[in-house]
Amino acid sequence: MPKTIPETPSAPKSLAPYSPAAEAAGLVFLAGQVGLDPKTGERAPDDVTAQAHQVMANIGAVLGDLGLGYDDIVKTNIFLADIDDFNAVNEVYASYFDGPYPARTTVQAGALPAAFLVEIEVVAAR
């Protein structure tokens, strides 16, 4: 089964050597998104709510580049620097879906790249 790396002009500039998205077998895999504004390259404030909104906006923009939306997400993995932010991130996350929600895993990662507070990766289906 062939893999493709689609164009994602709305994705923030990568912080490491990876593609923002990859597609195979009708599934689209988005690399973890952090609270980085793709237009300015600036990070969202050091507040988990602000960062979570930026993360979800980034996810929506990248999915939009691929002709997809939040309703196409089938699985998410949420990484938190601090599990005490679980409820705040849940509130933001839930506001982007009408339900039913995608399958999901949430873990405390301890430390995230560049001291971000939240990172979310998604799998979407065509």
Can you annotate each of these PLM segments?
Residues P2-R126:
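Short, polar/acidic, helix-capping and beta-turn segments at strand->helix junctions
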